[in-house]
Amino acid sequence: MLEQQPTQNPLTVSMLNAQAQQVDRPLRENVKQAVRNYLRNLDGQDPTELYELVLSEIEHPMLDMVMQHTRGNQTRAATMLGINRGTLRKKLKKYGMG
């Protein structure tokens, strides 16, 4: 039987607005803004491997924080991430983390 996952709020990033008030924005909005800024600064050139660039900018710190949270326990980290341990080990190696 499928296990129901608890409803989770989207990941948010706390930011300060112009009035120095804390504002929580969904992570996806920050990613959209970062990609928008990146594309705007290309001076008309088309990027290559944009998908890999964005993915690595998100994946590396996520793996780092999950590994810290699990105190290096790869089995627990893989379970938290919803991937198998072999895939986790491959990703850790890719980023020089394992």
UniProtKB/Swiss-Prot annotation:
It holds the Pfam family HTH_8. SUPFAM superfamilies: Homeodomain-like. This is DNA-binding protein Fis. Activates ribosomal RNA transcription. Plays a direct role in upstream activation of rRNA promoters. InterPro entries: Fis_DNA-bd (IPR005412), Homeodomain-like_sf (IPR009057), HTH_Fis (IPR002197), Trans_regulatory_Fis (IPR050207). HAMAP family: DNA_binding_Fis. Residues 74-93 bind DNA. The keyword Transcription regulation applies. It comes from Glaesserella parasuis serovar 5 (strain SH0165) (Haemophilus parasuis).
